[in-house]
Amino acid sequence: MIALKGVKMAVIHATQDNFEKIAGTNEIVVVDFWATWCGPCRAFGPIFEQVSEKFDDVPFVKVDIDQSPDLASAAEIKAVPTVMVIKRGDVIYRQAGALLPADLEDLVNQAKAYDPSKDDEGNSVSESSESENDGE
């Protein structure tokens, strides 16, 4: 389930069986943990789908916490909806609550630009930690 450039992807409904493969084979994955009984989740669903159409290179994944309770537990989901962004297999963002379309779009753009190997000043993390150890 690797995203292909130029190919519009529908929102993927993930389960315990396919979630790890999706998260492990894509650079960035945006996840919406939700439940059918959750009013805010149902209101956020169309926003999630709408924004997903703007990013053909990023999979947007929905996980129903009642259908995949072990996955929700492993992800430490305490409230729904919860939006999570995974980059290179690491969770780089998690927030309970729905987002506005512009905020979700900004979040995806920030995730695409985020480089976990750089610090806030743009220096390589390995370089900055090496220079700190030089004085010892």
Q: What do the PLM-derived regions correspond to, one by one?
A:
Residues 27, 34-37, 79:
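Short pre-active-site segment immediately N-terminal to redox-active cysteine/selenocysteine motifs
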Residues 26-30, 43-63, 69:
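Conserved helix-turn-beta segment immediately C-terminal to the redox Cys motif
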Residues 11-28, 69:
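A short beta-strand-turn-helix
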Residues 87-117:
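Non-catalytic, surface beta->alpha helical segment in thiol-disulfide oxidoreductase systems
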Residues 1-8:
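Short, Lys/Arg-enriched N-terminal segments with co-localized hydrophobic residues
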Residues 69, 75-86:
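Structural micro-motif
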